[in-house]
Curated annotation (Swiss-Prot):
Subunit structure as annotated in this protein's UniProt entry: Forms complexes with Hsp70 and Hsp90.
Superkingdom, taxonomy of origin: Eukaryota
UniProt gene name: cdc37l1
Coiled coil location: 35-73
Lineage, opening ranks: Eukaryota, Metazoa, Chordata, Craniata, Vertebrata
Official protein name in the record: Hsp90 co-chaperone Cdc37-like 1
Length: 285
């Protein structure tokens, strides 16, 4: 079954939002359990029913997400996109797609790319909160998308430690955005609440975050492995080298294959110097 990117994104967002609501309900239930009165018993029963419903919803979204991941690349960039020297010139130079708001997204990345990359290298809650307090406009879906693209690029280069660092920050941004939606707030006004809960490691919240982070890292690895497999197939000779008179045909087909727009998928030319600087930054932050 084919799913549009909007369906994939909606599924991922709903899954995160459901996890957060589930954590909220669990915390409420734990709080009510500390009191012993008839009214509290009624509230506890209602909270338990809400918790059960959220658990069912979470399982349903997980099933949908699993179905999407089997047939689609769930919104990660394709090999073609990565083969455009994405991080040499920033991902604003990808082949343009006819989607609403594209111009605004490009303008946003042009303006904030360096700061997004800096945020992606932060590893401590306090540092991330302070940086977003300085640059609240970074709290946006454009930032989350850029971080996801960066994760995919890093894993394709087998820079696993950097990928895991950026994935952490991508999930941070995704959770903040979904928290804002569930509270009907501007994301720039509620990111402090996220960090407050994260730093306290309240029951339910931190577990939901860690679960989502592991899922993202697993999907990034799976996506990169699929891209490497496809690249290996494209590079495989169409004929064995000992076919004698067919050697000319083999060479011709090899030339055709190498001229294919996907042929260089394993010969990416990323901005090595910039990513070396990112690695140094991660070590010092």
């Amino acid at each position: 079954m084919d799913f549009s990117h909007s369906q994939q994104n909606e599924c991922a967002r709903s899954s995160v939002a459901c996890k957060w609501s589930l954590a909220e309900a669990q915390q409420k239930l734990n709080s009510l359990a500390l009191h012993n009165s008839e009214s509290m018993d009624q509230e506890q029963a209602m909270a338990q029913a809400e918790l059960s419903e959220l658990q069912r919803s979470e399982e349903e979204w997980r099933r949908k997400e699993a179905a999407l991941s089997q047939g689609e690349n769930w919104g990660l960039p394709t090999t073609d996109g990565l083969n455009q020297d994405v991080f040499n010139k920033s991902f604003i130079n990808q082949v343009k797609k006819s989607i609403d708001g594209e111009d605004q997204s490009i303008s946003f990345i042009q303006k904030y790319e360096a700061k997004i990359r800096h945020f992606g290298m932060l590893s401590r809650w306090n540092d991330s909160q302070h940086f977003l307090s300085e640059y609240p406009d970074l709290v946006s879906e454009e930032t989350a998308k850029y971080l996801l693209l960066w994760c995919s690029h890093l894993e394709s280069e087998q820079k696993t430690a950097l990928m895991e660092q950026v994935a952490h920050q991508a999930v941070v941004m995704q959770f903040i955005i979904e928290m804002a939606k569930s509270c009907n707030m501007d994301p720039r006004g509620c990111f402090r609440l996220f960090f407050q809960k994260a730093k306290e490691e309240k029951e339910g919240y931190f577990e939901a975050f860690k679960s989502e982070l592991e899922i993202l890292k697993s999907k990034v690895r799976q996506h990169a492995e699929c891209q490497r497999y496809e690249a290996a197939i494209l590079r495989k000779p169409a004929f064995p080298p000992d076919l004698g008179h067919m050697g000319t045909q083999q060479c011709h087909q090899k030339d055709v294959l190498q001229s294919h727009p996907n042929a260089a998928v394993c010969h990416l030319n990323p901005m090595e110097h910039a990513e070396d600087e990112d690695l140094k930054m991660m070590d010092t932050l």
